[in-house]
Amino acid sequence: MDRAEKRELVTGLNEAFGNAGSVVVAHYAGITVAQMNDLRSKMRAAGGTVKVAKNRLAKIALQGTDSASIIDLFKGQTLIAYSEDPIAAPKVASDFAKGNDKLVILGGAMGTTSLNADGVKALATLPSLDELRAKLVGMIATPATRIAQIVNAPAASVARVIGAYARKDEAA
């Protein structure tokens, strides 16, 4: 890599860290290419990204961002997983680490808050933003549905009584 490529990488990572809802840092020593591609595809499907960069360049890119507190995590073979959704990157990384003991989560950041490995795993257990929105919409819609049923109940009762009278007259 020449200097221009390094500058581009640092600029790209800096923008990514600035826009990221969460960042996860993990050791990946011993992971095969197929496993890494699997992790990347799962992360991409969840709306996140996995990058492997030189630690020195990642540290430079982190300077001046909200996630600057995790600079100390960059030792050894590290990968960076990030996503705009604060839950997506930790969830995919934690799920992958459960099935593959060679991926060791070191920690991460969500905004200005730095997280240790347990914090990242705890964050991964939370529902995603879309799931929370769906639950909220469901909670809001349920009372409206019940009110509509209660309002329509007297009309339905009257219709049943009239229907019963009509059947009674036809039978007689």
UniProtKB/Swiss-Prot annotation:
BP-aspect Gene Ontology terms: translation
Coiled-coil zones: none
Keywords for this protein: Ribonucleoprotein, Ribosomal protein, RNA-binding, rRNA-binding
Domain of life: Bacteria
A single GO cellular-component term on record: large ribosomal subunit
Pfam families according to UniProt: Ribosomal_L10
GO terms assigned for molecular function: large ribosomal subunit rRNA binding; structural constituent of ribosome
CDD domains documented for this protein: Ribosomal_L10
InterPro entries noted in UniProt: Ribosomal_uL10, Ribosomal_uL10-like_sf, Ribosomal_uL10_bac, Ribosomal_uL10_bac_type, Ribosomal_uL10_CS_bac
NCBIfam families: PRK00099.1-1
UniProt family annotation: Belongs to the universal ribosomal protein uL10 family.
General function of this protein: Forms part of the ribosomal stalk, playing a central role in the interaction of the ribosome with GTP-bound translation factors.
Subunit annotation: Part of the ribosomal stalk of the 50S ribosomal subunit. The N-terminus interacts with L11 and the large rRNA to form the base of the stalk. The C-terminus forms an elongated spine to which L12 dimers bind in a sequential fashion forming a multimeric L10(L12)X complex.
Full protein name: Large ribosomal subunit protein uL10
Lineage: Bacteria, Pseudomonadati, Pseudomonadota, Alphaproteobacteria, Hyphomicrobiales
Gene: rplJ
